[in-house]
A protein has these predicted regions:
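Canonical Radical SAM [4Fe-4S] cluster-binding loop centered on the CxxxCxxC motif
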Residues: 17-53, 65
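Radical SAM enzyme [4Fe-4S]-AdoMet core and its adjacent flexible, acidic
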Residues: 133-149, 153-343
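Flexible mid-to-C-terminal extensions adjoining Fe-S/redox cofactors in radical SAM and related proteins
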Residues: 297-439, 505-506
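N-terminal [4Fe-4S]-dependent radical SAM core
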Residues: 1-26
Length: 506
């Protein structure tokens, strides 16, 4: 087996998204849903449909707070919202790209046609084996590919190929090994599936060794919708784990851009890869400079960072070949393409693979959220993480975490900065007593509790008191430093409440 090849965020393009200027903004016209998804972080409200006028007022406020390319219409299940076509039409009329995040259960050919006419730009379909979907309960990820193909074909055929199609899958420990198969499936349908998204499961853990508070008052995180008793021992999956799985079938797999965390600048919360090829072959991967060029170019000419594109733009990768003079990654693709003249007329596609790593809770209680998250939603006049709204609804503020027994008292693992787990190899090697490879359950971000910058003193290290040193009478003015007694650096162990980013849709 090939040794793990570490991801190198220092070589990737840091996506320029931020709170005020982003590619996407989240919108929930309803919190009513027609499915139960184990990874969902929104409570199903049978009376959750909002008046269209209220939703439009929310969008008017969003315009004042945030520049955005696309509006992700989610929920709940947006396809059962009675005004979904009118809402899509309104969003498109404002110059935004309407994108629907759906479980696909209510999708019909007629609805695809109506939404296409209203100006819909893209669908993101959430399908995975932990959903309680009638007729599909108990099916494996492989068996669910039949449903994925049915939805992709419906979107392609009834939109005339003008609406982009993406698929989300929440990844759990028991489905991690399905990633190579899902990656192959997505490539086999590059002509109809423009994006594949892997969302790494998170849930709040009530028994993770933390005391949780909201506004200074103790709270029971077991009351949150994203707490699942049977997931208390679930080990968090990291972006590196997903990359390792993809590299089992494609050793050349290499991301090009990422979004970091609020606490760990090297954590890869949104990790983007751009693959060039067709259903039978991969010609290569586009590099960081290309990702940067696309974002900067789009922002310069259209004033926003790029979200979704129309499918025809990613069906003609040959149009990029003139840039081979300036781009090493495009040059590699071009040279590989030249070696097969019999396929020069075949259509080349660009397919995005996005890995989303939700909230990481460190041993000192800090919560590592997405810095500049695209899925921010308006809540009571401010933009907040959509995956944490349940905390705001129940407690009026985000939850904060403190290790039981004092700082790091019951922690099981150190933060990446202390362990060297998320540092470049050369830097990690300089740290004392480095812990073995990247902690598997120590990072990730999802809708976990607290992310309010209530600076809980990051892992305060307890310093063993050192006996004062007697100084020579001749030099009273220059006290020597205390005897070099080693710090008893509180080694941490991890306990981490978390939540799921796995919205039953996106």
């Amino acid at each position: 087996m090939n040794p793990r090849r570490p991801l190198t965020p220092e070589t990737y393009y840091r996506l320029p998204w931020n709170l005020a200027d982003n590619s996407i903004t989240w919108l929930e016209p309803t919190t009513k849903c027609n499915l139960y998804c184990e990874g969902c972080y929104r409570e199903n409200d049978p009376d959750g449909h909002r008046p269209l006028a209220d939703v439009i007022r929310e969008l008017e406020t969003v315009r004042k707070l945030r520049r955005t390319d696309g509006i992700s219409i989610a929920g709940g299940e947006p396809l059962i919202y009675p005004h979904i076509v009118e809402l899509v039409r309104y969003v498109a009329a404002q110059g935004w790209k309407p994108i629907i995040n759906s479980n696909g259960q209510a999708l019909t050919p007629a609805l695809v046609r109506d939404l296409t006419k209203a100006g819909l730009v893209g669908f993101t379909m959430h399908v995975d084996s932990h959903q309680k979907r009638p007729g599909w309960i108990g099916k494996t990820e492989l068996e669910l590919c039949e449903l994925r193909e049915k939805l992709a074909n419906m979107i392609y055929e009834h939109s005339g190929g003008t609406v982009a199609c993406a698929f989300n899958a929440t990844i759990y420990r028991d489905t991690l090994d399905d990633i190579p198969m899902l990656t192959r499936w997505a490539q086999a349908h590059m002509d109809r599936v423009q994006t594949m998204v892997f969302i790494l499961f998170r849930s709040v853990k009530a028994q993770a060794g933390f005391d949780c508070h909201a506004g200074g008052k103790p709270v029971d995180v077991g009351q949150l919708v994203y707490h699942l008793d049977h997931m208390e021992t679930h080990k968090d999956i990291l972006a590196q784990d997903v990359a390792d799985k993809i590299r089992e079938i494609d050793p050349d797999f290499e991301p090009c851009a990422f979004l970091n965390g609020t606490e760990d600048p090297r954590s890869m919360k949104w990790l983007l890869t751009l693959k060039v090829g067709d259903k039978d072959r991969t010609l290569g991967y586009l590099g960081p400079r290309f990702a940067e060029l696309v974002q900067v170019f789009h922002h310069f000419f259209w004033g926003t960072y790029l979200a979704y594109t129309r499918p025809w733009l990613v069906r003609t990768a040959q149009a990029l070949f003139p840039l081979a003079l300036f781009s090493k990654s495009i040059r590699k693709v071009f040279l590989k393409w030249l070696k097969e003249p019999g396929k020069w007329t075949d259509c080349l596609h660009i397919q995005s693979i996005m890995i989303i790593q939700p909230c990481d809770v460190f041993e000192d209680g800090r919560q590592n959220m997405c810095d500049g998250c695209p899925d921010a939603i308006l809540h009571k006049g401010r933009m907040v993480w959509s995956c944490r709204v349940d905390e705001l609804v129940k407690y009026g503020t985000f939850i904060t975490c403190t290790p039981r027994g004092g700082c790091c008292g019951t922690a099981t693992q150190a933060t990446p900065a202390e362990s060297g787990a998320n540092l470049p190899a050369e830097a990690a090697g300089t740290l004392p007593a480095a812990k073995p490879e990247a902690p598997l359950a120590v990072k990730p971000e999802a809708s976990a509790p607290a992310v309010k910058q209530e600076v809980k003193a990051p892992a305060v290290k307890e310093e063993a008191p050192a006996a004062p040193i007697e100084m020579p009478a001749a030099a009273p003015q220059a006290p020597a430093p205390p005897a070099a007694k080693p710090k008893s650096a509180a080694k941490s162990k991890s306990g981490k409440p978390k939540a799921s980013k796995a919205k039953g849709k996106k």
